[in-house]
Structure formats: C-alpha cells, structure tokens
C-alpha cells in the first residue's frame, strides 16, 4: 500500500508513484460529500512535503504582511483624502458601503472557493484589489474615490478570507488558531510602519503614489503562492489523487449554473437593504430638509422592502440559499457571529501619531493572539477572559476623551481593548469551525465575516450619524465670532483644521468639539458590552483537543 506521506515525498522529487489503492483515493478525494474546490485542496495536501507546506505558510505570511501594511497606510490616509475633496464628513459613508458589500460578498466567495477552487478565489480577489488601487491612484473626485474604496475593501476582505480558508485547509483544528494568530502578527510591524509610510507619501509625494506602489508589491508577493498551489495541484493529478472532470455544460448553461449557485439575486438584495437603511444616518446632515427629505425617506423604505424581499427569496424561492440558515440554528455559530458583530470604537495629531493611537489595539491583539491560540482548548472560558479587558478599555475612554488627557492614556485604553479583542477573535473563529466538517469551513468563516462586517457597518452608521449631526453644531458653538462663518469649511477640511496652531481659539474650538462627539460615541460603545457576554453564553463548551483525539482530524493529508 502507498501511504500519503510516501506519495508526498515521491511527488516532491518529481516521481509519480503508482497508486493502486483506489478505494482509499476515492474515499479521501473523490467523495461526493466534497465539492470540487475542497477535493482539490485535499488532494494537494496529500502530495506536498513538509518543506512545501512551510514554504506556503511563509508566502501566505508575506501576503498578509503587505496587505496589512496597505490597510494601515490607506486607513491613515483616508481622512486626508476625503478632506482633499472637501468631503471629510463623508468618511463614514465611504466606509459603510465598502464594509457592507465586502461582508456580504464573502458568502459568494465561499461558493467560489468551494466550487472553483481556493486559488481561483484568491486570484479573483487579487485582481479586484489591483484594479481598485489603480482607480484610487487616478481618481479625480469623491464619487470615483468612493467606488474605488468600495472595490478595494471588497477585494481586501476577500483576499484575507481566502488566506484564512487556505490556512484552515493546511492545519488541524487544534493547531489552526496558532497559525491564524501568527499570520496576524504583521500587524505589529504595520502599526508602526504604516502611519510613517503614509506620512512620507503624503508629505513628499502624494497619496496616489502610495496606492500605485502597493499594487505592484501585492502582485509580487501573491504570484508565488498561486504558482506553488497550481504546481502542486498538477502533481496531485499525476499522482492520481485528483481526477479532473468536465461539467458537460454549454457556455450559457455554465453562466446560468453559476448565477444560481452564487445566488446573485440574494447578494444584491441584502447589500442594497443594509446600504439603504444605514447610509441615511451619515448623509442626512447634507439633505435639504434632514429626515423629511424625500430621497432619505425613500432610501429607508426601499431598504426595508429589499430586506423583506431577501428573506422571502431565501426562504421560498432561491434554488441555492445565499445565507445557509441551517448554520444559524447552531448556538455556537450564531453566538460567535453575534460576538464578532458587536465589536467597535484619534485626537488632532500628526498623521503618524494618529495612526499609532488608532492601531494600538490591533498591535496588542496581534502580540497576544498566538499565545492564546496555543493554549486554547476550552475556547468558551478563554473568551470570557477577554470581557474585563474590553469593558475596562472602552469604559476608561469616557473620562479620557478630554482635550487635556495625555495621548499615552488614550493609547493604554486601546491596548486594553486589543487584549480583549485578541481573546474574542481567536476564540470566535475557533468556535464556528469546531462544530462543522472540512466541507463547511469556508461557509461558516464567510458567515462569521459577514456578521462582523454588518456589525461594523452598524457601528459606522451610528458613529457617522453622531459625527455629522453633533460635530458641526459643536464646532459652530465653540468657534470665535470672527470664524463662525467658516464652520462648515473647517468641518469638511482636515488640513485646514490642522493649520491652526495650538493655543489659538480656533484650534481649541476644534479640539473641544472633537472631544465632545467622541465621548458620546464611546458611551454608545459601552452600552453594547452586555451583548458581548450574551453572545458567549450560548456557545457550546467544546474542548477541541479532546474532540480531535476522539473524532480524528477535520482536514487530511500532510498538514500542520
């Protein structure tokens, strides 16, 4: 009999062994229980060596590093870019549309990686990101930037999702969160490097060069991953672990099949629903009659109607459900998704320093997460441990959101939130994957990500509404009489805000207005904390170490 490890060693030496155990091959890789994309990755895992496995880990780490660095750079630049178009107040609106679409699209991407393959999904998302970065680098107005940012964020979330799915394919459940957490450690570097890089581009060149440079870098680190995976898939075909079958469908039949399989109607309806319901909270301040404006009312009504149609479509009409409701009946999955959906929270600083404060919670999360992933067996109790840190960090921001508070104190609160987040992120992902088979890992990760995006978009909508409705009035009230006429211009232009020197009446008014609205945002965030506890309570208490000892590994082949 030819064992999987022997086959892997032989194939790595370009020797194609003769595989006689047809029954084993059929049960492992050609089972009807697995979709084509899952079969392909299980076949690849059966033929590669440990060296190739670790090389792939390293290359995926490089992809994550460049991607996280780009996120840090563009997040730091975003307020200044919207301000350059004199639309700084629309920052939340830009993020809401992007967050909703990216979250909803991951379920469609889950279908792509399961039906077509992991690499096909990764390559598609890479193409989306590159096109979006080119659009960002060449945009001439706010409308073009909104479109580019929406496309970019969809591609970014999709790429990270594909990396997570591939890491899940390459690991046992017991060791998965170690690799997930390690793959998130580039945040440690991007926290410090990202804002500084953004500052250098913004000060010495412009934001357009930043996006162009990162488009080239992202392609450079992604291509080796694609080449290795395609090469190993070819090896698995030669070894007999994978049999490629033709669908037998015509071109039109293939288009129809994929439109149904990816439930395009469902994704359009749910994206439209959340976008139309949440966007008015951020843009109502620009409407002529506020909430009484016709198009604001129409957006809310159409959004609710789209939501109702989506539920009816998914329940009674959709041949393939966009949102697999059967998974939402599992308390561990729904609890983890709700937890991820509940999580949210800079002072007028330089670009670099503001970025450090903004990213400090991600930094502490990245440092602690690998250790938590290593020791987490009963993940439910580990998640409980994150609640005090999250509550303390968020609550302390209420008194600390004052102009005279040191930046160090604000940063400490973000570190505390990051510690809590590290528990939640590690344990939450582990929770959703612990109760499904390899076949369903991509889908439950997509659902988990969708809930996070919806929660983030709700948070952005609330924050955007408070920002756009409270800040202008506070700014007007605090500005000296001779500057009140410029209140609207100051509100929309961040560079103009920073041009006023410390100690001037205008600068004091701006800082005071920011502190007031941010303090109210933090109070709203603290009110969400009871939902965190409730979300964890309903999890099943699964010990994943004992589970794998009793039931065997979730994945197969030469894995970590």
Swiss-Prot record:
Transmembrane stretches, start-end: 53-73, 90-110, 115-135, 146-166, 177-194, 211-231, 264-284, 291-311, 331-351, 354-374, 379-399, 407-427, 441-461, 522-542
This protein's record includes keyword Kinase: no
Positions bearing carbohydrate: 29, 404
Keyword tags: Glycoprotein, Membrane, Transmembrane, Transmembrane helix
GO cellular component, one term: plasma membrane
SUPFAM superfamilies registered for this protein in UniProt: MFS general substrate transporter
One annotated GO molecular function: transmembrane transporter activity
Signal peptide: none
Topology relative to the membrane: Multi-pass membrane protein
Primary residence: membrane
Pfam families, sorted: MFS_1
Induction cue: Expression is induced during iron deprivation.
Intrachain S-S bonds: none
Compartments it resides in: Membrane
Family per record: Belongs to the major facilitator superfamily.
The protein's role, per its UniProt record: Major facilitator transporter involved in siderophore transport.
Official protein name in the record: MFS siderochrome iron transporter 1
Species, as recorded: Ajellomyces capsulatus (Darling's disease fungus)
This protein's encoding gene: MFS1
